[in-house]
Amino acid sequence: MSEVVPLDTVDAPAKPIIDFELVTIPEEELEKLYRVIILNDDVTTFEFVILALIVVFEIEESRAEAIAWETHTRGEAYVATLPLEEAKEKVFRVQYAAREQGYPLEFVIEPEE
């Protein structure tokens, strides 16, 4: 049988030992802008692309149509310049909706130079 030691007799360090490093991200890093580029594929319809650009990226219909056409003819097109988290969120929303409809729509998010 093991001996029970009362807790009040156990020596504990006076201060807890905590080892951590505080990492700060400069504000300019948080505010960096990224370009969202839409890529062409042979499956996703013009209608879906145009609607997604209007609803998710809040682009005017005529501009959305121009982006869809440029994507089709050149293989890719510039959509918007946004902070990284916003760009990722919008791309995720469009790609999720695309997958739900069976479309392989893809985007690229790249740092603005």
Label each PLM-derived region with a short phrase.
Residues 2-113:
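Terminal domain-initiation and capping elements
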